[in-house]
C-alpha cells in the first residue's frame, strides 16, 4: 500500500502513539539558506513518525488530506499529525535545501493566511508572487507568496486549503507535484 510506505507502518492501537524521532544526516553540497520561521496557524498537531491512521482519521472527519505519493530525491518525512478540533492536518519534511511544511485546514487559503500569525517580527509579511501552474500534476493553479525569503504555495480544494512552506520555489513545488489525497493513496499499490 503506497500510503503505508509514505506514512510508516503502524502497529499500535491508535494514531496518537508516540513514534521515534526520524532524522536525516545528509547535507547539501551548497550553502544552506538561513531558516525562516514558518507561518504560525496556532498550536500545531502533535507530530508522529507513523501517521497513516491520523491521515485516514482526518479523511473520516471530511478533511481532504494530502500526502506525497513519492518524496523527491534526498527528502525525508519527519512525521505527520492531525487535530480534529480545530481541524488541522500537518506534515513536516526535510529536503536537501531545508525544512518544508504541509498544513491543511478547512476554509480557503485567504482565510487561513489572514488568520495566521506570520512571525513575531513585525516586518515579516506575505508578499504575493506569480501563481504556479501544476495542472500537469492534476492540482491546477497554486497561489504563491514570499514570506521573509521563504516560499509559500497554497491551493484551495473542496472546502479546505493546502499550504506548503519551504526555503525556495523549486523545493516547495517539488512537494506540491507529488501530492495526492490520502484516500486515493491508500488505494494504490506500491
What are these regions (language model features)?
Residues 1-5:
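Sec-dependent bacterial lipoprotein signal peptides
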Residues 7-41:
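Short, low-complexity, disordered segments immediately C-terminal to signal peptides
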Residues 11, 79-80, 183:
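Generic short alpha-helical hydrophobic face used as a protein-protein interaction/packing hotspot
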Residues 14, 25-26, 117-127, 157, ...:
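Compositionally biased non-globular segments, especially hydrophobic aliphatic-rich helices
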Residues 37-149:
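Short, solvent-exposed recognition patches
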Residues 130-190:
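A short, solvent-exposed beta-edge/loop patch
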